[in-house]
Amino acid sequence: MQHIHFDAIVIGSGPGGEGAAMGLVKQGKSVAVIERYNNVGGGCTHWGTIPSKALRHAVSRIIEFNQNPLYSDNSRVLRSSFAEILRRAEMVINQQTRMRQGFYERNGCRMFSGEATFIDDHRVSVRYADDNHDILSADKIIIATGSRPYCPPDVDFTHSRIYNSDSILKLDHEPRHVIIYGAGVIGCEYASIFRGLGVKVDLINTRNHLLAFLDQEMSDALSYHFWNSGIVIRHNEEYSKIEGVDDGVIVHLKSGKKVKADCLLYANGRTGNTDTLGLKNVGLEADSRGLLKVNKIYQTSNENIYAVGDVIGYPSLASAAYDQGRIAAQAMTKGNAEVHLIEDIPTGIYTIPEISSVGKTEQQLTAMKVPYEVGRAQFKHLARAQIAGMNVGSLKILFHRETKEILGIHCFGERAAEIIHIGQAIMEQKGESNTIEYFVNTTFNYPTMAEAYRVAALNGLNRLF
């Protein structure tokens, strides 16, 4: 057993941990990074963002091949199994892991692969797979342990046909019909993936419409697209029992309905990874969802301990977690942070087609009694979309009628998560620089999807009187 001292300890090597570790070493601090698994990257790289987006990309290309007359004359259909596209995802995961491992090595972070448990405010025990352990100490410690799928105790996740969003990546059979319980971001993304592979999908939503945090038009567009593709959405439903049987799974709903399929993906909620940290030893307590409370510089109620990423809840985005880590690193060394997380964080939802938004929704602006106007552009009217055969989609700009300040941008369609950043860049400008007129007065490359901003801006300004 070793006793080793560092300036800072980072628990977790996902986006939040990486942001914190890189921020600390750039300020000349000695840093230990503790990762419970053998590979760095956290849930984002191995079970969440990277694999699901790699799967989605592969499926969307299959759909494009089968629907585009340039590639297919409908005499044959390109098919691929879930296992085959998983192999592609594994290649991307391996590339990401090697790259991130290199970040830590080049920057002199000391890596420890084991389970971290607090001993006191400055000491952490690291227990390894062989049951040996070391004790690390530091002036400051940051928790970036992420989250895991919520698994209710009355659901038998040991059954071979019942999965959560982590274990679904080990799917070893070819389902013809899948039930997805939970219609949040993860549930909707996997509904797109499975339907794109030709699998029947029942999407059980515990709420009254999809992704309620989105602008209503974006939510409605996704609902229609799902319906048009053959996904069966069951709103306002909750299970009373989930029964694993020999040939699949039966979901008994409280409404009296029963749904049977070859397998079930349970995707309803996540839990912070805090239960094994020994938080009581440092005077901390997680809430019922395993989440920690922090202040604006990501400091917990223990002044020596900080927390970032999924383990603190909203916004639970990999991009935000990395920035939170950088901000916390600055606060840990200087006592405060000169930079803060931006107010309007873009959201990307990688369904097929994808959705992205930044800023306020129409519902929010109406409730706030803000005099706004709407500018719209349909992808089907853009030359680049026609060339690429990506006619499904639209861009919507919400702006103040009097000041012309951009208040929100919402995009539905292929490349939405890329397109959104053009508008975000203008929204982040201060004062008169944030104006919808920028898109009219600038020159766009032609033909491009970005040109949707000019079309939407003209459409919106023409509504003013």
UniProtKB/Swiss-Prot annotation:
A single cellular component GO annotation: cytosol
Sites where the protein binds FAD: E35, R36, Y37, N38, N39, V40, G41, G42, G43, C44
Cofactor section: FAD
Co-factor: note: Binds 1 FAD per subunit.
Major subcellular location class: cytoplasm
InterPro entries registered for this protein in UniProt: Class-I_Pyr_Nuc-Dis_Oxidored (IPR050151), FAD/NAD-bd_sf (IPR036188), FAD/NAD-binding_dom (IPR023753), FAD/NAD-linked_Rdtase_dimer_sf (IPR016156), Pyr_nuc-diS_OxRdtase (IPR001100), Pyr_nucl-diS_OxRdtase_dimer (IPR004099), STH_gammaproteobact (IPR022962)
BP GO terms, sorted: 2-oxoglutarate metabolic process; NADP metabolic process
EC number assigned by the record: 1.6.1.1
Compartments reported by the entry: Cytoplasm
Catalytic reaction list: NAD(+) + NADPH = NADH + NADP(+)
GO molecular-function term, one example from the UniProt record: NAD(P)+ transhydrogenase (Si-specific) activity
Record's keyword annotation contains Transit peptide: no
Family designation: Belongs to the class-I pyridine nucleotide-disulfide oxidoreductase family.
Function: Conversion of NADPH, generated by peripheral catabolic pathways, to NADH, which can enter the respiratory chain for energy generation.
HAMAP family reported for this sequence: SthA
Designated name of the protein: Soluble pyridine nucleotide transhydrogenase
Originating organism: Photorhabdus laumondii subsp. laumondii (strain DSM 15139 / CIP 105565 / TT01) (Photorhabdus luminescens subsp. laumondii)
Gene symbol of the encoding locus: sthA
